[in-house]
């Protein structure tokens, strides 16, 4: 009997232990399968692209709503991760990860400010590569004057302390930064991603303007960027469809030594003049298309090609605006014999042109207007010399 009682007690203890273990197992939270829930780079499918009409120097593609891939040129690759989304595992070292919202940008590429301005996104920029007095874009100047945007040094000498204190999440540089690669390395070492703007390498003026879409992607305003670009194309469409006027246009400025700086035939200014219906007075035969497509020639060479030009446009963005033909002739009396000078068809482009990247369309409209009417008024960037 005693032996039987011991056996029954042992059986009851085993049963109790089993029940307790099952209960504890029921209370234990399930461990998620990390391999199934985590987002991986290889698992992303970029199956939707931002439509581009003319730009060739960048592309934007999407994997769902949370991941945007941006490529620039042949050597820049970015993954833009939506706010509150997971950073994928296994992102290649060649891909720079950015996190939305980008709200502490260091903007050194001054030509890009106009894109941010049109997207109502100047407030995303905390640091500037220009001082307040150097800005012609009012929203940028105002932001610096009120202190929401601060000067952080030019491309070759950034203020690293200010950049780190601001919590900078992206530095946007122009291609001049390639002359000081150590700056890129230092920024990246301190945790600041670097994007080098290449709109100047677009072969088409309309491709330059289309970079609005890239900045729209960076700040999450692609729809606004696309609609504004479509409006601009619609405004230019009647002009682009017209036949050339046959009139010749020279675009130039005179440097301090008396030589003349002109655009090569493949430059975007030369192409903008052609889009407006003019024939650009060319000084080369290469048709080279790159960001440095300017050349300096002697005044005698310029005179030989431009003496019969129907219209002259003086590029005052470099050495200051001129207002009269007499001021132009002070720089070079030889120009007095030029057809455009004698007929009073000499114009000056205003200094704010190069900061207003989207205004390239307005320049096309301006040139078209003076080709149609030598007395055209109320233009965006061109002013007739008196």
Predicted regions: what they are:
Residues 202-230, 311-386:
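Structured C-terminal subdomain patch of bacterial secreted/periplasmic proteins
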Residues 99, 153-158, 174-181, 202-209, ...:
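Soluble non-cytosolic domains of exported or imported proteins
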Residues 103, 110-113, 128-139, 179-182, ...:
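Extracytoplasmic ligand-binding site segments that recognize negatively charged/polar headgroups
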Residues 68-74, 78-164, 170-177:
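A short, structured surface patch at a secondary-structure boundary
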Residues 241-323:
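Flexible, glycine-rich surface segments
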Residues 4-22:
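Sec-dependent N-terminal signal peptides of Gram-positive bacterial secreted proteins and lipoproteins
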Residues 19-113, 224-251, 375-386:
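Bacterial Sec-exported substrate-binding components of ABC uptake systems
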Residues 104-107, 124-128, 170-174, 194-198, ...:
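Structural recognition of the beta-strand scaffold that forms the well-ordered cores
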């Amino acid at each position: 009997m005693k032996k039987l009682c011991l056996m029954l007690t042992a059986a009851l203890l085993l049963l109790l232990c089993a029940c307790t273990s099952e209960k504890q197992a029921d209370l234990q939270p399930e461990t998620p399968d990390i391999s199934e829930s985590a987002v991986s780079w290889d698992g992303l499918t970029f199956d939707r692209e931002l439509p581009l009409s003319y730009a060739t120097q960048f592309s934007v593609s999407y994997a769902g709503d949370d991941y945007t891939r941006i490529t620039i040129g042949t050597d820049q690759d970015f993954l833009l991760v939506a706010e509150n989304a997971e950073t994928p595992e296994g992102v290649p070292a060649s891909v720079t990860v950015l996190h939305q919202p980008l709200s502490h940008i260091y903007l050194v590429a001054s030509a890009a400010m106009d894109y941010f301005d049109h997207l109502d996104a100047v407030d995303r920029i905390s640091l500037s590569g220009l001082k307040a007095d150097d800005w012609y874009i009012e929203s940028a100047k105002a932001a610096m004057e009120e202190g929401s945007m601060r000067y952080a040094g030019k491309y070759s000498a950034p203020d690293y302390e200010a950049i780190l204190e601001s919590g900078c999440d992206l530095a946007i540089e122009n291609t001049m930064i390639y002359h000081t690669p150590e700056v890129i390395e230092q920024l990246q070492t301190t945790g600041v991603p670097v994007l080098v703007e290449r709109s100047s390498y677009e072969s088409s003026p309309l491709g330059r303007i289309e970079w609005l879409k890239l900045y729209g992607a960076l700040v999450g305003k692609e729809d606004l960027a696309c609609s504004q670009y479509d409006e601009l194309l619609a405004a230019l469409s009647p002009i682009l469809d017209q036949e050339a006027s046959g009139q010749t246009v020279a675009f130039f400025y005179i440097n301090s030594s008396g030589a003349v700086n002109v655009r090569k035939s493949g430059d975007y200014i030369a192409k903008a003049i052609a889009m407006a219906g003019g024939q650009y007075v060319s000084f080369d035969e290469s048709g080279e298309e790159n960001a440095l497509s300017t050349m300096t020639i002697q005044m005698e060479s310029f005179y030989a090609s431009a003496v019969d030009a129907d219209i002259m446009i003086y590029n005052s963005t470099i050495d200051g605006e001129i207002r009269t033909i007499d001021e132009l002739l002070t720089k070079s009396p030889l120009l007095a014999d030029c057809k455009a000078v004698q007929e009073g068809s000499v114009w000056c482009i205003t200094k704010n042109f190069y900061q207003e990247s989207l205004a390239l369309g307005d320049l096309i409209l301006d040139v078209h207007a003076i080709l149609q009417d030598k007395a055209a008024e109320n233009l965006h960037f061109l002013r007739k010399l008196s």
